[in-house]
Curated annotation (Swiss-Prot):
Top-level taxon in the UniProt lineage: Eukaryota
Gene: KIN10B
Full protein name: Kinesin-like protein KIN-10B
Annotated residues for binding of ATP: G114, A115, T116, G117, S118, G119, K120, T121
Key words, A-Z: ATP-binding, Microtubule, Motor protein, Nucleotide-binding
Region described as Disordered: spans on this chain: 496-519
Protein's organism: Arabidopsis thaliana
Length: 628
């Protein structure tokens, strides 16, 4: 079982809590080549007052420029000096308390951030004599898996030139970054390797390390050219899965100092771009901006769960003691990251195999009941109004005649013009009108089991009468459907055609669909305020305003409910703008067109966007009609 003396134990048992990103500072020692340099006096530009690495309270970190005597002060959570074993201290005091939560279904993230040559890769990977945070974390998790009978798996990938690549696959396998319906990031195509011992971990992990992109630069002999991410997933007995992400970020580079050219310059540009996007995310979260630019780069999308998401996060800011400017930029972003709050929540339980077996049994039972339901449906059809008063079986000839009437109804619907034809087609358009298909009226006929004709059926003279009664009931159903469609469509608030050709139908009269009449010009519903206006132009303008208001309501409703593909079908909205709209409405639904200005639209652009959408509706051809 998990040690009950873990300091964070009480917090880990909560189903959800608020946790700020914890930021600690690690200053690496001077390298031998730096000590031998005459320009290096061995003095660090970083100092601390107010605590050490063992203190839980915040510390004040001072940066002093030896050339200009400029001083800067920042508040961080902990400070770890230039001791050779300070990585082990960081693990014991910062990373180790996060591990028990993984076995309870929580996620955690540890990322090393800093300039190139500041010791990030050494902090995460380490060497044989001084292991880094990755092997130390794996060793602790494996020992806890033995005690709790849990399983551990690892995945290892890199973000190189803003593309994700699986490092555990022999062949180059690019990973797709996707979002689910809840906004959680998923990596499609990422492989995982079960790990039961440190030897298995070292075998898989070292294979991935060798495949990671590194190169020699002017500032570092072995410089990482990509962001490396090691994911350790744990599945406990209750099938609750938690994971920890160990991220080794590539360092930002000053190409004036490195002298990068060619491919190295392109790599440096992508690295700096992703780190700049990371700083924009930190800025947006600190200032509570309505839009956080997670989607600017693959790196920020991956870190979306760690910065402002649901993971407990630890940032290890790595510094070179002899570089003031680089240290200043690193500590500045790290200090701002401390104020980011994560809403840490418990991962849902995974279905057990027993539940899956039960689901198969339920599926089998459902299939059996489906057959019974069909039989019951047929029995209901026998008792339907189609059978007349005698409740006898309908003959095949009567059904064939009724089906002929159905084809006649379809022909009359075609003659009724595009306006009536659209009322019988189920489709989703810009304004979200979902109409009811006329085929629903024929479900009793479709499910009816035809009986073979008998002599008794041939002698039955009530078949024609039953058919006429059926037609009358179908007409009543049709009127009910049209009434329901009128209630469903919000556009009827502005436009409500009145059928001036409507006449009372007799019980034995033919269906109105069988004798299509010449369509007449529809009239607008009588609004008392508008009808009191004098002049046709004033009335027309009033109806136009009502129509415009209804279109705006439907347009806003569409923006709040449509998915990414449906939004992209609108004129003027591309893929990135559709993603911005989805992010905006997750915070709060759009209430007016001016809300689009929150994602960068100007008022003129919003007007043009709505104009383009309505042009597509108004450009549709209108069927010509004449009045007597």
């Amino acid at each position: 079982m998990v040690d009950s003396k873990t300091p964070a134990k009480t917090k880990l048992l909560d189903s959800s809590s608020i946790s700020n990103v914890r930021v600690v500072l690690r200053v690496r020692p001077f390298l031998p080549r730096e000590i031998s340099d005459e320009s290096c006096d061995g003095r660090s530009c970083v100092s601390v007052i107010g605590g050490d690495g063992g203190d839980t309270s915040e510390v004040a970190v001072y940066l002093k420029d030896p050339d200009s005597c400029r001083n800067e002060s920042y508040q961080l959570d902990a400070f770890y000096g230039r001791e050779d074993d300070n990585v082990k201290h960081i693990f014991d005091r910062e990373v180790s308390p996060l591990i028990p939560g993984i076995f309870h279904g929580f996620n955690a993230t540890v990322l090393a951030y800093g300039a190139t040559g500041s010791g990030k890769t050494f902090t995460m990977q380490g060497i044989d004599e001084l292991p880094g945070l990755m092997p130390l974390t794996m060793s602790t998790i494996l020992s806890m898996c033995e005690k709790t009978r849990s399983r551990a798996e690892i995945s290892y990938y890199e973000v190189y030139m803003d593309r994700c690549w699986d490092l555990l696959e022999v062949k180059d396998n690019e990973i797709a970054v996707w979002d689910d319906k809840d906004g959680q990031v998923h990596l499609k195509g990422l492989s995982s390797v079960p790990v039961k011992s440190m030897s298995e971990f070292q075998e898989a992990y070292l294979c991935g390390v060798q495949r990671r992109k590194v190169a020699h630069t002017g500032l570092n002999d072995v410089s990482s050219r990509s962001h490396g991410v090691l994911v350790i997933s744990v599945t406990s007995q209750g099938l609750v899965t938690g994971k920890i992400n160990l991220i080794d970020l590539a360092g930002n580079e000053d190409n004036r100092r490195t002298g990068n050219e060619g491919i190295r310059l392109q790599e440096s540009a992508k690295i700096n771009q992703s780190l700049f996007a990371l700083s924009n995310v930190v800025y947006a979260l600190n200032n509570n901006l309505p839009r956080v630019p997670y989607r600017e780069t693959k790196l920020t999308r991956i870190l979306q769960d760690s910065l402002g998401g649901t993971s407990r996060a630890l940032m290890v800011a790595c510094l070179n003691p002899g570089e003031y400017q680089e240290s200043l930029r690193t500590v500045s972003l790290a200090a701002r990251s401390r104020h980011i709050s994560n809403n840490v929540s418990l991962n849902p339980k995974v279905e057990t195999p027993k539940v899956k077996i039960d689901m198969e049994a339920k599926l089998q039972a459902w299939l059996e009941s489906k057959g019974k339901m069909k039989s019951a449906h047929r029995m209901m059809a026998i008792r339907s109004p189609l059978m007349g008063t005698n409740q006898t079986s309908i003959s095949q000839s009567s059904v064939k005649k009724l089906l002929c009437h159905r084809s006649a109804i379809a022909e009359s619907a075609k003659l009724a013009g595009t306006g009536q034809r659209d009322a019988f087609v189920t489709a989703r358009n810009l304004f979200g009108v979902e109409t009811l298909a006329a085929s629903h009226l024929w479900e009793p006929i479709r499910n009816l089991q035809l009986a073979s004709p008998t002599k008794e059926d041939e002698r039955d003279t009530s078949g024609e009468e039953n058919l006429l009664v059926s037609e009358a009931s179908l007409r009543d159903n049709t009127l009910d459907v049209e009434k329901k469609y009128t209630e469903l469509s919000p556009l009827r608030e502005a436009l409500s055609p009145i059928d001036s050709n409507a006449k009372p139908n007799s019980a034995h009269g033919s269906s109105p669909f069988l004798k299509p009449m010449t369509p007449k010009t529809p009239f607008l519903s009588t609004n008392p305020e508008i009808m009191q206006m004098e002049g046709t132009c004033q009335k027309f303008n009033a109806w136009s305003n009502n129509l415009k208001t209804s279109l705006i309501k439907e347009y806003i409703h569409f923006l709040n409910t449509a998915n990414r593909e449906e939004l992209r079908e609108l004129k003027g909205i591309g893929q990135k703008m559709a993603e911005y709209i989805i992010e905006l409405r997750e915070t709060s639904p759009l209430k007016s067109l001016t809300d689009l200005e929150k994602i960068g639209f100007t008022s003129r652009q919003v007007h043009n966007l709505f104009k383009k959408a309505t042009e597509g509706v108004l450009e549709k051809p209108v069927s010509a009609s004449t009045t007597p």
